Amino acid sequence: MLQHHQQQAQSGGYYDHYTQSPSPGSLTNADALNTTPFSVKDILNMVNQTEAYEGSYGHIDGAATASALFAAGEYQNPHQYLNHQQHQQSELPIPQQQLHHQHLDDGATTSSSLSPLLPPPPHQLYGGYQDYGMPAHMFQHHHGHPHQSFQHSASAYNMSASQFYAGASATAYQTPATYNYNYAGSGEVYGGATPSAVGIKSEYIPTPYVTPSPTLDLNSSAEVDSLQAPTQKLCVNPLSQRLMETASNSSSLRSIYGSDEGAKKKDNSQVTSSRSELRKNSISGNSNPGSNSGSTKPRMKRKPRVLFSQAQVLELECRFRLKKYLTGAEREIIAQKLNLSATQVKIWFQNRRYKSKRGDIDCEGIAKHLKLKSEPLDSPTSLPPPIPNHVMWPPTMQQSQQQQQHHAQQQQMQHM
């Protein structure tokens, strides 16, 4: 025990000079009595330090280099560190070598929490790892002892360092388990996708817009066959197939529309020809009954107007004043007397009755119009009002005579 206290006293000054802070477990840690040159905890802490240094300053892009450096850091760095520690411990006395391992262990944990370029200790990483939102099932013991498993702490540090130090490039330091997990998750995007969706990106060919040419026959199927050929080639791609179907449908609609227009033109020509034929037929039909009847006149050919002589008109006017409506016998008598037909006499009386009715209406309108005009004309005929004497100057002879007569009448009235 005395020897043990002496070794601690000798190492106290060296430790204070080395770390400038006392170790919390330097007196109570059971590992201080361990005489083995190196412990597993020392090796793991140094591996974490080397990985933190490489993660903060190194630039690794590929997954293969990440796995290679991870293996190199796991297997080669401990041997290099062993050689370096053996060289340093050979220079130190034996009592100080035992405490030197303990101080390196404690100093690694304290300096990692203080320095900004080194990772925090594993017991701090697990809480921060859960805050970053990563799934907890990636690690078997995410609440265990800080020095229980190297792979768990290293993977937790690598996930936190990817956001703190090196961004996206530091994710290459993940363990193979997390590396495969991430690529499996990202691979599901392409693995779960249908081959048609991939074909849309790789084998997409824009559908050519078919422009109608004036020399192209819309009823021919050459255009539709040329459009159906690429659809058979890209049958795997549903999007392009739909586009090609719409193009083929539009071409078929064009052909149908063109055929409909041709049919409409033919129908219009037929209608016009039938109309002309109907006109000819109606003319011939109207002329045939006129020729068959003989007495009746054809309607299409107007007969020239018959002019009545003055003697005939005077006789008809006298008969009309006597009687406006004639019987059949009276028409025959007048027709024989005037050398006219009974039909001409009948038509003349009809026209005369119509003219008489119009004349009565016109006469009434003219009479009303004349009456309206005569009313304002009667007012100027009345005598104007007498003009006062002081207005008229000098007075005329008539005015002087009128004035004298007026004074004489007034004097007579006064004497009476």
Curated annotation (Swiss-Prot):
Role description: Required for the development of heart and visceral muscle; for the formation of somatic muscles. Has a crucial function in the early mesodermal subdivisions.
Highest taxon of the lineage: Eukaryota
Comp. bias regions, Low complexity: 281-295, 397-416
Subcellular localization: Nucleus
Keywords: Developmental protein, DNA-binding, Homeobox, Nucleus
Annotated PROSITE patterns: HOMEOBOX_1 (PS00027), HOMEOBOX_2 (PS50071)
Gene this chain is encoded by: tin
Disrupted gene: phenotype observed: Absence of cardiac and midgut visceral muscle, and defects in a subset of dorsal body wall muscles.
Protein's name in the database: Muscle-specific homeobox protein tinman
Effect of mutating Y173N: In strain: S-5F
Stretches with biased composition (Polar residues): 1-11, 18-33
InterPro entries associated with the record: HD, Homeobox_CS, Homeobox_NK-like, Homeodomain-like_sf
